[in-house]
Amino acid sequence: MTSQLAKKGEAWSARFSEPMSDLVKRYTASVFFDKRLALFDIQGSLAHAAMLAKQGIIAEADRAEIERGMTQIRGEIESGAFEWKLDLEDVHLNIEARLTALVGDAGKRLHTGRSRNDQVATDIRLWLRSEIDSIVGLLGDLRGALLDLAEKNADTILPGFTHLQVAQPVTFGHHLMAYVEMFTRDAERMADCRRRVNRLPLGAAALAGTSYPIDREFVATQLGFDGVCRNSLDAVSDRDFAIEFLAAASLIMTHVSRFSEELVIWMSPRVGFIDIADRFCTGSSIMPQKKNPDVPELARGKTGRVYGHLTGLLTLMKGQPLAYNKDNQEDKEPLFDTVDTVVDTLRIFADMVPGISVKPDNMRAAALQGYATATDLADYLVKRGLPFRDAHEAVAHAVRACDDRHCDLADLTVEQLREVSGLGDKASLIGDDVHSVLTLEGSVASRNHIGGTAPDQVRAAIAAARKAL
């Protein structure tokens, strides 16, 4: 029975008296998704083999054979010729079996001093480190596209909103720079997350370490890690780094989703602030006139998908005792899907933003509604000596009067403003120059400080952001 089981290919089959059922094989196998780690598995194995040879644990000739075999396997994987087998369960055993078929006993010696527990933890970290670097680069591409659009619209005025009600005029460039700030923080978070990803678990073996005289620091250097995980139990069971990545990815998608929501609103014919290029939109199977902003809508939807992966992995980890448990096999698909979602989203948005057509006349017309310069009038009165709360109340009276007259503050004469302000003997604080603060241009220009919406400040912020890129 033992020899019969051994032919089945399980690395542990000699322990059992009957073969695994086909249903259980399918249920427990991970090869059809974790094969994505194959090239990183080879990278880690080559570094491990080099360490084993350096330490005299295996012969140099065996190391050379392992390298020869792995080089061939890498080529087979890259060309699509490698045959992945369900019976071999996962990426690690598939590669090891092929290596042994190619180089014989040298391949059987590769697993000396390690376990699949520390092996897979190493593979995931190598893969995730690479993906983080790609995501940081894509965030840079998107920020660059936003900066270009912001620079073109540093003077374009639109209404700023709170509660989706007109609040104060801002420039479109300033509005876009808010997203540059968000995506800059996202890049910083990813870079910080990378620091904790970039620790080597290999050498922890199954959970307790190994009795072989290994050199973990050598392997860490070979693989570009900043150092080693300091506790073997934690090294094989830790998925904090994966959860942290999913949290950072969720914030990226949060910011994409907020931007998407605004794009959808701005593109609505009822608003008409922008148009999105046709190649990022779809039509309707029944309504011939439709041009739907499907890309931002779908990005908004995919954000919930990424949130789900974060919640799923947190739930996966919350009840596990030390050390490694089979539950952890479920850590990979959420990571893989999140990376694919974030990468595709950032690529598409970096391509979509340069093609956004801005409609400044519509933006300006909207900013002229809703008393967007009311705060400027209050500030005008404060600068003439009125306490802010009194100024606030006076302007509120004026706004109410404008509501009744169906006009804007700027439409009232100086005398009318004095009359409706309710200021009584202080109404003379409203001078003949009052209309200068009720213009959109005057309003945005007055916010001329770091972080303000004045065009000069927007251009300075753009220059600083370009330098940071």
UniProtKB/Swiss-Prot annotation:
Gene: argH
InterPro entries listed in its UniProt record: Arg_succ_lyase_C, Argininosuccinate_lyase, Fumarase/histidase_N, Fumarate_lyase_CS, Fumarate_lyase_fam, Fumarate_lyase_N, L-Aspartase-like
Pathway of action: Amino-acid biosynthesis; L-arginine biosynthesis; L-arginine from L-ornithine and carbamoyl phosphate: step 3/3
The EC number(s) this enzyme carries: 4.3.2.1
Protein name: Argininosuccinate lyase
Gene3D superfamilies for the chain: Fumarase/aspartase (C-terminal domain), Fumarase/aspartase (Central domain), Fumarase/aspartase (N-terminal domain)
UniProt catalytic activity: 2-(N(omega)-L-arginino)succinate = fumarate + L-arginine
GO biological process, any: L-arginine biosynthetic process
Cellular location(s): Cytoplasm
GO molecular function, one term: argininosuccinate lyase activity
Cited HAMAP family: Arg_succ_lyase (MF_00006)
Main subcellular location: cytoplasm
NCBIfam families reported in the protein's UniProt record: argH
Enzyme class: lyase
Keywords for this protein: Amino-acid biosynthesis, Arginine biosynthesis, Cytoplasm, Lyase
GO cellular component: cytosol
Pfam families reported in the protein's UniProt record: ASL_C2, Lyase_1
Family classification: Belongs to the lyase 1 family. Argininosuccinate lyase subfamily.
PANTHER family the UniProt entry points to: ARGININOSUCCINATE LYASE
Organism: Cupriavidus metallidurans (strain ATCC 43123 / DSM 2839 / NBRC 102507 / CH34) (Ralstonia metallidurans)
